[in-house]
């Protein structure tokens, strides 16, 4: 997706700061066939499922950046009255070591939702390298 391509380009070019307003959420939408419980209660409603999976997508993007040594936050950058898609992912490269809890949470989320984020494919070498040196 365009957002994942932009994030991967920034990471691969050692960007110190990354700011993206994510679009292109459909990749995980197609992967989620059945939500882990108790989330199935929400995902049985099409619109709610779409919005929830959008949030899962952006949360996984943020977590991948965190695993690669970025301090990350997700903020609203335009009021909700203008658009429902008003999230910005902000990341600053710190190189800080990652806590094992962060890795565990990412792995559990991917496993529970049975998804493979496109960004993780694009950055698989860097994620593996971070794991090999003990950063993950």
Q: In which residue ranges do the predicted regions lie?
A:
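Class I S-adenosyl-L-methionine
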Residues: 1-136
């Amino acid at each position: 997706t365009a957002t994942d391509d932009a994030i991967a380009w920034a990471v691969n070019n050692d960007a110190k700061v990354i700011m993206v307003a994510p679009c292109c959420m459909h990749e995980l939408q197609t992967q989620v066939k059945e939500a882990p419980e108790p989330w199935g209660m929400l995902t049985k409603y099409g619109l709610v499922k779409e919005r929830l999976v959008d949030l899962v997508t952006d949360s996984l993007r943020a977590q991948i950046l965190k695993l690669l040594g970025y301090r990350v936050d997700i903020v609203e950058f335009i009021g909700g009255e203008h658009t429902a898609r008003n999230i910005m992912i902000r990341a600053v490269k710190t190189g800080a070591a990652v806590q094992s809890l962060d890795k565990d949470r990412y792995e559990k989320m991917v496993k529970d939702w049975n998804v493979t984020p496109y960004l993780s494919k694009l950055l698989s070498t860097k994620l593996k390298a971070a794991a090999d040196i003990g950063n993950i």
